[in-house]
A protein has these predicted regions:
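Transmembrane alpha-helices and immediately adjacent membrane-cytoplasm interface residues
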Residues: 45-48, 52-59, 71-116
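Short alpha-helical linear motifs
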Residues: 55-60, 187, 205-207, 249-251, ...
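Membrane-embedded and juxtamembrane structural elements of multi-pass membrane proteins
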Residues: 26-49, 97, 107-274
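Transmembrane alpha-helical segments that serve as helix-helix packing and pore/cofactor-lining elements
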Residues: 16-81
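Cytosolic-facing loops and C-terminal tails of multi-pass membrane proteins
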Residues: 2-9, 13-17, 85-110, 229-312
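Juxtamembrane extracytosolic/periplasmic "stalk" immediately C-terminal to the first targeting helix
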Residues: 30, 63-69, 115-120, 295-305
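Short C-terminal domain-edge/linker segments immediately following a structured domain
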Residues: 65-67, 178-182, 288
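Alpha-helical transmembrane segments and their immediate interhelical/interface regions
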Residues: 1-22, 181, 191-195, 199
Length: 312
């Protein structure tokens, strides 16, 4: 079991390193659609590996073994996982569970606050201009998505620049970017090694909206100029809620540089490399599952009894 767990851990670390690098060489939409489910799957693999390690120690406790068919003596004899490693895995799993539940409760509270504060202002899909001196524009989460622009920013923009901002924010709503980002944050909450991947996903989401805006207004230079100008105008703190998607989010200089270049091309090598890492992660996690099952099968008193009376 030790080798299976070691392989799974190496695969998880490899994904955590490779994913942000691959994200730079994929189109923003593809990067988001690939990295988010891959991150969630890797986080799930992390939980499974920790659980499998913890189970080897928990299964030796008489109170737990009473609910199963295995022998604590046989399990202890067959278990290759040192007790300190298993106990540490249980502690990490417990802390991760508590932290994730706390994170989830805070995000639900924030989502409800966004809905409470903005849903009554105007029908879904419309543009709301807030009377605020803060320069900002953001989109509330779909399906009840709304584009919010402060009066300070709205008045400072030209009509064409307003079109860019609205196209950018509507892209966030149309493609449910808030939910993609939340899923990535969930994964990195479970496994902190995935935080760089979550940051790459946030950048990809903003770039995705930039590319959509460039398609809608048919002028990449205008989009780049609008993003840069909006960032310069934003001299104060944002007024938008934490769960909103803003036009000035992400790495603004990098976004501007990308818009001044041709649309991103497909990079099959990055896609293939990431898929290979994902396949290895899945295979090693399955290996941990099979090894763990075999370990408990060895300790199963019923199976041992059958083998004793029916030798091969």
């Amino acid at each position: 079991m030790t080798s299976a767990v070691f392989g799974a851990i190496l695969a998880i670390v490899a994904f955590a390193i490779a994913a942000p690098l691959a994200g730079r060489h994929l189109s923003p939409a593809l990067a988001t659609r690939l990295l988010v489910p891959a991150s969630v799957a890797t986080a799930a693999s992390t939980v499974f590996v920790l659980g499998a390690l913890a189970a080897t120690w928990l299964g030796q406790l008489p109170a737990i073994a009473a609910f199963g068919p295995w022998s604590t003596t046989r399990l202890d004899a067959a278990d290759p996982v040192p007790d300190p490693v298993a106990v540490l895995s249980l502690v990490l799993l417990t802390v991760t569970t508590v932290w994730t539940v706390t994170w989830g409760a805070r995000r639900v509270h924030a989502l409800l606050a966004v809905y409470r504060d903005y849903h009554h202002l105007s029908p879904t899909g419309s543009v709301i201009v807030l009377d605020s001196a803060t320069v900002d524009a953001f989109a509330t989460p779909a399906p009840a998505g709304q584009v919010i622009v402060t009066a300070a920013l709205w008045d400072a923009l030209t009509p064409n620049e307003r079109r860019v901002v609205l196209a950018h924010e509507r892209s966030h709503i149309d493609h449910r970017h808030t939910w993609w980002t939340l899923a990535a944050e969930l994964a990195s909450t479970i496994n902190p090694l995935l935080r760089p991947t979550t940051a790459a996903i946030r950048r990809a989401v903003e770039r995705w909206a930039d590319e959509d805006a460039a398609i809608r207004v048919t002028d990449r230079t205008l989009v780049a100029r609008t993003i840069a100008r909006t960032a310069l105008l934003q001299h104060d703190r944002r007024s938008g809620p934490h769960l909103s998607q803003a036009a000035t989010g992400g790495d603004v200089p990098q976004r501007v540089r990308a818009l001044l270049e041709p649309p991103p091309r497909r990079r099959p090598f990055a896609l293939v490399a990431l898929c290979v890492v994902l396949a290895v992660t899945a295979a090693t996690t399955l290996g941990v599952e099979r090894t763990s099952d075999h370990l408990f099968d060895q300790a199963d008193t019923q199976i041992a009894h059958q083998h004793h009376h029916h030798p091969l």
